[in-house]
């Protein structure tokens, strides 16, 4: 350090320029050695003067030395600003603390570091005799708003005699140290019947207080029945009796009796309106509804097993609660539901669409049930048909009929049975042979029925609605493959209307023996009852051509991959075989799996051809026939 200073002095100037105690010397030491400078030295340093000396030095300075001194000035200035900031904050805290009120320490708490308290801190002051004055008279003054007594719960009594410890002698203070004064242990008498102020207004003020009616109404008259309702005055004090008057004199007794009579009369006057108000029916007060709070029973309760099972199996509580529930929401009118049920089947699944009234009239006209006047003529035939003899006769005639001839007749014309059924129903006793003979219809009938088929796409034929059916290998079809309208099944019976509240109309599977227009073929006859599993059914309309299955619409990603592959394979000079592993380069596991899935979809649809020579090997894709 000394060697460096001597070198600087010899080169740039006198020894006083960068001396240790000089301002520039301290700046240079703070910049190079980061020396600590205390508050005193920092206060003595004048930053303005040092900056002027660096800018206009008395001796020439090198640029390096001036730069070092400038850095030292910045360091010293930062330290001075930090000290100033700390002083200002401390001063602000002290000012705030001076205006803040300090809490008084608790005298019962010991200060920190002390284990013994002072005698004055733990010693209570001696009791001083206080002169309460005539406190009993002030209690009767009506200015006390909170003063309130009850008639049935008031008892007047004296605990001590009036002459006990009234005038304690000064020489007996040591003996009377543990004896309480009479004023401290004597209850004050509220009625004040023996005081000088004997006015009835002050004495009976407690009977006229507000809210006394409600108190009398809420209290039970049986409670406190043994307590006397009249106030018994206590004997007066000795200083209240005038001198020269004997307490037991007749004059004194007359005064007491007069007071009692006046008190009884006042009590009767006060009780009469109370009884009248008590007899009046009071309106029931509404109580505030309390919120339901959950209560936890922590006691251990043992319930027998059969009792617990009976609780679980008892559903009376559930049924009672279910009856009280009300259906919320708007109920749809029955008329609207009935009209909607009569709409075509296609409109039952479409809520917002409207059906044209002209088309609805045409549809209802074609599906209208023919009403007949003779509804009872159908029942004897049904009973006759359901008899065992009729069934056996039908079966016997069926076996005698040539099966080839019957099938040939039914195959000549498929559209004629609708007209056959309409003509056969006009006669009651029509036989099966006449039905089969009438199956040959005229060309005009066939053309008119063909025109009726094209009314609606969901309705084929005028009288018989059916679905196309194909006979089985045995020449008989199941009864579930055909639906026969009620016009051909029950011409003389009224068609039951289906409503939302009633069940559906019975179908042909429930009563197959009611269809008298068809013959039955039984493979075997059961012992108790017959079944109509095998029945020859006639097609009432031509077999409809089945629509081809619509091709599934490709997804957007699949279409995009398909278009890219098609563009690639159609590009001249492009390779016709691509590797799936090369296409999946740079993809993560999820994206590669999706690419493999899309490739499988395209291969399934014939867009591309997929080839894999070895398991877990490279997958090659090429152009497919459907691209």
UniProtKB/Swiss-Prot annotation:
Key word Nucleus present: yes
CDD domains named in the record: Rad21_Rec8_M_AtSYN1-like
Amino acid composition bias (Basic and acidic residues), ranges on this chain: 254-263, 272-282, 395-408
Primary location recorded for the protein, binned into one broad class: nucleus
Biased composition (Polar residues): 467-487
Subcellular locations according to the entry: Nucleus
BP terms from Gene Ontology: chromosome organization; meiotic chromosome condensation; meiotic sister chromatid cohesion, centromeric; sister chromatid cohesion; spindle attachment to meiosis I kinetochore
Tissue expr: Isoform 2 is expressed at low levels in buds, leaves and roots, whereas expression of isoform 1 is confined to buds.
GO cellular component terms, semicolon-separated: chromosome; cohesin complex; nucleus
Endoplasmic reticulum as UniProt keyword: no
Pfam families: Rad21_Rec8 (PF04824), Rad21_Rec8_N (PF04825)
Domain of life of the native organism: Eukaryota
PANTHER family given in the database record: SCC1 / RAD21 FAMILY MEMBER, SISTER CHROMATID COHESION 1 PROTEIN 1
Family as reported in the entry's similarity comment: Belongs to the rad21 family.
Function of the protein: Involved in chromosome condensation, pairing and segregation during meiosis. Responsible for cohesion between replicated sister chromatids.
Subunit structure: Component of the cohesin complex.
Name the UniProt record assigns to this protein: Sister chromatid cohesion 1 protein 1
Organism field: Arabidopsis thaliana (Mouse-ear cress)
């Amino acid at each position: 350090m000394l060697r460096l200073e001597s070198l600087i002095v010899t080169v740039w100037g006198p020894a006083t320029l960068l001396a240790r105690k000089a301002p520039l010397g301290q700046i240079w030491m703070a910049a190079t050695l980061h020396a600590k400078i205390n508050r005193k030295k920092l206060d003595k340093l004048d930053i303005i003067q040092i900056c002027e000396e660096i800018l206009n030095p008395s001796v020439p300075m090198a640029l390096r030395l001036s730069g070092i001194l400038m850095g030292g000035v910045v360091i010293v200035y930062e330290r001075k600003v930090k000290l100033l900031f700390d002083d200002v904050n401390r001063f602000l805290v002290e000012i705030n603390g001076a205006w803040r009120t300090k809490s008084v320490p608790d005298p019962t708490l010991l200060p920190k570091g002390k284990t013994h308290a002072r005698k004055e801190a733990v010693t209570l002051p001696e009791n001083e005799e206080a002169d309460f004055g005539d406190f009993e008279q002030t209690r009767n003054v009506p200015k006390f708003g909170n003063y309130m007594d009850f008639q049935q719960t008031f008892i007047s009594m004296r605990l001590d005699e009036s002459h006990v410890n009234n005038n304690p002698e000064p020489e007996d203070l040591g003996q009377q140290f543990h004896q309480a004064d009479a004023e401290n242990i004597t209850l004050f008498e509220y009625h004040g019947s023996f005081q000088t102020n004997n006015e009835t207004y002050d004495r009976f003020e407690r009977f006229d207080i507000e809210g006394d009616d409600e108190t009398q109404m809420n209290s039970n008259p049986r409670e406190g029945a043994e307590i006397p309702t009249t106030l018994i005055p206590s004997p007066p004090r000795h200083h209240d009796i005038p001198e020269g008057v004997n307490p037991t004199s007749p004059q004194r007794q007359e005064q007491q009796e007069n007071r009692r009579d006046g008190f009884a009369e006042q009590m009767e006057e006060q009780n009469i309106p109370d009884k009248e108000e008590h007899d009046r029916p009071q309106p029931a007060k509404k109580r505030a509804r309390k919120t339901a709070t959950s209560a936890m029973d922590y006691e251990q309760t043992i319930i027998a097993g059969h009792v617990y099972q009976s609780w679980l199996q008892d559903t009376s509580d559930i049924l009672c609660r279910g009856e009280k529930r009300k259906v919320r929401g708007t109920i749809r009118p029955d008329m609207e539901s009935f009209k909607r049920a009569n709409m075509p089947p296609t409109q039952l699944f479409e809520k917002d669409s409207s059906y044209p009234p002209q088309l609805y009239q045409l549809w209802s006209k074609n599906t209208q049930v023919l009403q007949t006047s003779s509804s009872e003529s159908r029942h004897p035939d049904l009973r006759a048909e359901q008899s065992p003899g009729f069934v056996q006769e039908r079966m016997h005639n069926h076996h005698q009929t040539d099966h080839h001839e019957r099938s040939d007749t039914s195959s000549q014309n498929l559209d004629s049975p609708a007209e056959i059924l309409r003509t056969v129903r006009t006669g009651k006793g029509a036989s099966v042979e006449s039905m089969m003979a009438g199956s040959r219809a005229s060309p005009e009938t066939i053309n008119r029925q063909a025109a009726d088929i094209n009314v609606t796409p969901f309705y084929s034929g005028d009288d018989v609605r059916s679905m196309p059916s194909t006979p089985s290998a045995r020449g008989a079809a199941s009864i579930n493959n055909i639906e026969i309208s009620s016009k051909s099944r029950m011409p003389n019976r009224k068609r039951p209307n289906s409503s939302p509240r009633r069940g559906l109309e019975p179908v042909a599977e429930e009563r197959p023996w009611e269809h008298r227009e068809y013959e039955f073929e039984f493979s075997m006859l059961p012992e108790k009852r017959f079944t109509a599993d095998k029945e020859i059914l006639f097609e009432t309309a031509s077999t409809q051509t089945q629509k081809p299955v619509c091709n599934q619409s490709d997804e957007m990603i699949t279409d995009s991959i398909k278009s890219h592959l098609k563009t690639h394979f159609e590009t001249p000079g492009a390779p016709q075989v691509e590797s799936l592993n090369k296409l999946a380069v740079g993809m993560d596991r999820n994206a590669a799996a999706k690419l493999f899935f899309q490739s499988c979809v395209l291969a399934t649809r014939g867009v591309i051809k997929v080839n894999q020579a070895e398991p877990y090997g490279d997958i090659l894709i090429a152009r497919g026939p459907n691209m």
